[in-house]
Design a protein with these regions (language model features):
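Repetitive helical segments and hydrophobic/amphipathic motifs
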Residues: 12-14
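Extracytosolic ligand-binding ectodomains
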Residues: 2-9, 19-384
């Protein structure tokens, strides 16, 4: 640990000159529908409230040894506001000096904030919205620290291919996000020539006419498959699926084996220290969205320290360059892809209490960077 700290100090002292103070903003939504569980009647266990500004504060603290050595003071400006106030709040934060903003927002709100700040001197980090459409929008002042849907679905596809589970039954819920999740998985499956044997919608409405749409035995019958992929972003239906399908097959997607950027049970590459520190300081288990915010703040501080006379434009250029080498406690150095601003990172495939596989899966290679086997590669990417 002492050697690592001295290495950080030497790197900081060798870094080019920069402003002696910087303010990093963290903008989130009060009553974010992704974190608020309003279906208590369903007897779901409600987890502790997700407050990702905790992760932002921890990132600032984690790097304080380095920033102190470099003479940089980092201030965190964390705000949670109603949806109607997001655009104005973002503009006010930038106007008062927070030129670097980490966004913990749903996809539509990320777009609204990006549009409101168009032309402003700001660098936005979309930390938690996975929609691929945000990447293909190619906002010049934005990068994405959290993984895209396609990146996560590619991890599933690699794992299924490595296990020779080639035939997949896809079940899709009624929530608008469910269809997008199923579409992303289908694209990943097609990329690796997996077969979608059928795509079947399910419903939670318990009416006789919906019998085939809410009966698990019927939904999973009359077809052969190696695995079931379920797209159920709220989880009300999917929780009943494991051990109840017509055939004894694994379940992946929204339950069973899930994909994410982080898991508290990950034990390699210094991950236990990250998770334990978060648990101790917040009293809850770290989630993927927490890591996404933590690495976003860590990215920004690293960029600011390493760029002469740092500006949002020059910091983004550094983050998406080969010079950027970020430690995320995942065993490889991380940086952002220049064509879509997406953070290159491994994806963890995990159950509720164990990490089963880390993607890219061994055997999948790329001509320049193995991490680019996940997500839309440069040759297939286009701004839209």
């Amino acid at each position: 640990m002492i050697r690592i700290r001295w290495a950080l100090v030497l790197a900081a002292l060798a870094a080019p000159a920069f402003a002696d103070a910087v303010r990093i903003g963290h903008l989130s939504l009060t009553k974010d529908p992704r974190y608020v569980q309003d279906w208590g009647y369903a007897r779901l266990i409600a987890p502790p409230p997700v407050i990702t500004s905790d992760a932002a504060r921890i990132a600032v603290t984690d790097l304080q040894f380095t920033t102190d050595a470099a003479g940089l003071t980092v201030t965190l400006d964390a705000r949670a506001v109603a949806e109607a106030e997001l655009a104005a709040t973002a503009q006010q934060m930038v106007a008062t000096g927070a030129s670097y903003l980490v966004l913990d927002l749903p996809g539509a709100d990320v777009k609204a904030v990006a549009d409101a700040l168009k032309g402003q001197p700001a660098l936005l980090v979309n930390a938690t919205a996975p929609e691929d459409v945000l990447r293909s929008a190619c906002y010049p002042g934005m990068v994405h620290s959290g993984p895209s849907q396609r990146r996560q679905m590619d991890a599933f596809a690699q794992y299924l291919r490595s296990m020779n589970w080639e035939n997949v039954l896809v079940l899709v819920g009624e929530h608008p996000d469910d269809a997008g999740l199923a579409d992303a998985f289908t694209a990943s499956a097609e990329r690796l020539r997996l077969t979608i044997v059928d795509r079947r919608p399910f419903t939670l409405v318990a009416a006789p006419q919906n019998r085939e749409g809410n009966n698990i035995r019927l939904l999973t019958g009359d077809v052969d498959y190696d695995v079931v992929f379920v797209a159920d972003t709220r989880g009300e239906f999917a929780r009943y699926l494991p051990y109840a399908a017509q055939q004894p097959r694994p379940v992946i997607g929204s339950v069973g084996l899930t994909a994410g950027s982080w898991h508290w049970a990950f034990e390699r590459d210094g991950a236990t220290q990250v998770s334990s520190r978060f648990d101790k300081l917040t009293g809850r288990k770290i989630q993927s969205v927490d890591w996404d915010v933590w690495i976003a703040v860590k990215s920004l501080i690293s960029g600011i320290i390493n760029v002469p006379a740092a500006t949002p434009v020059s910091v983004r250029a550094f983050l998406t360059s080969d010079k950027m080498k970020l430690d995320g406690s995942k065993g490889v150095t991380l940086n952002y892809r220049p064509w879509d601003g997406q953070l290159r990172q491994p994806i963890l495939l995990a159950t509720s209490d164990a990490v089963i596989m880390v993607a890219p899966v061994q055997g999948f290679t790329h001509q320049t960077n193995t991490l680019d086997t996940l997500g839309a590669d440069e040759a297939e990417f286009a701004c839209r």
